Amino acid sequence: MITVALAKGALLNDSVARFQSAGLDFSAVLDPGNRQLMVPSHCGRARALLVRNGDVPVYVAYGQAQLGVVGYDVLREHQMPVAQLVDLGFGGCRMAVAVKASSGYQHAADLPPHCRVASKFTHCAREFFDALDLPVELVHLTGSVELGPLTGIAEAIVDLVATGRTLRDNGLVAIEELFQSSARLIGHPLALRLDRGDLQLIVEAMRIQESLPKNPA
């Protein structure tokens, strides 16, 4: 049986739609009354695991799921040994450095050495500032990192930005982009090598789907 790790939250609806187009119907996970965390597909040849976003690559890396869908930001942060198979094109956002709009900083390199930077993504932040050769103290927060500069716990933040509205509403502005992120189909490397064709059919169906021209909004 094929096991697929799906992230709860913003990526779930589009993830289910992509697998449905590839022949696996996990629409039962979208039922408001569903409380199951392991849900079989309608065809009975696959099942979905409903997990936290950051746990998707963990389940795939350890082989408990052969496939999964997760944001590129999570892959960059956790560095798990999984195969990145298809950029699915939804869940688009960017990882960025943001500061108070009144701070006067224009670029990340303008930040003072050894200042505090708050983030949920401390690995990504460390890589970025190390590449700038700018020593900073990273403060790991698990939610509402926008409060960092507002309370004075940090001079800047590194966080995901979609529309930028949350930053603007809190008097912050993005000054530098680390990378773009979107949802990715990932796989367990050994499972893919031992695959008798079932996994490859799903991967190819999704790859073909992403190569088709998109209808204009």
Swiss-Prot record:
It comes from the Bacteria. Pfam families: HisG (PF01634). GO terms for cellular component: cytoplasm. Keywords: Amino-acid biosynthesis, ATP-binding, Cytoplasm, Glycosyltransferase, Histidine biosynthesis, Nucleotide-binding, Transferase. It catalyses: 1-(5-phospho-beta-D-ribosyl)-ATP + diphosphate = 5-phospho-alpha-D-ribose 1-diphosphate + ATP. GO terms for molecular function: ATP binding; ATP phosphoribosyltransferase activity. Belongs to the ATP phosphoribosyltransferase family. Short subfamily. This is ATP phosphoribosyltransferase. The lineage of its organism: Bacteria, Bacillati, Cyanobacteriota, Cyanophyceae, Synechococcales. The gene is hisG.
